[in-house]
Amino acid sequence: MFRYLNNEERANTWTHLIAVAATLAIAWPLLRLAHTAQLDQPDYQLLGTALFIAGMLLMFLSSTLYHAITEPMHKARLRIFDHIAIYVMIAGSYSLICVSVVGGWIGWTLFIFLWACVLAGVIGKIIALGRHPRLSLALYLAMGWVALLILWPMWQNMPHAAFWWVVAEGVFYTIGAYFFNKDEEHAYYHAVWHVFIVLGAASHTIATWLLLS
């Protein structure tokens, strides 16, 4: 499959294929940790962790397939699925924090809001067929930085090391957005965007591990 790809698409494919393998490697240990962890509001900690892992795996796998496939019709469909998966990843990342760290009406309201954004993003992608990538980027960033609304309860209820890893995650994604926005103008900028996505996901994985430990 890869022999038909140009060098940029090879880079785009490999950056997230490696991330797929890493996600599969960490999934079971993280789920086991979630099963035994004792958070202040533990009832939904396994659900929140599972949603994060599922979102991360879906995002990296759909991205890998999109960049690896060369057949135009399949590639167009996978592009839409790739963008939808990012919505799922963002909502999945905050699910554990919303339901097990923040909790209460604030946490659950934010949880519902984020997954409503996923639904809106899915509908928008299907209707618009992925014609507005910059609008999607704006929604990605808005969903990601909605954590600003819960910074104080996060700081109060999370280990501070985990908190700063979540901050680092947001910084990585925001820097990466610059390269995504310029990827049609510069070679390999999309692969650089992928690297920042991996760094952001890794930061959140570390934060989750510290939170559950």
Model-found features: residue ranges?
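Multi-pass alpha-helical transmembrane bundles in non-GPCR membrane proteins
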Residues: M1-S213
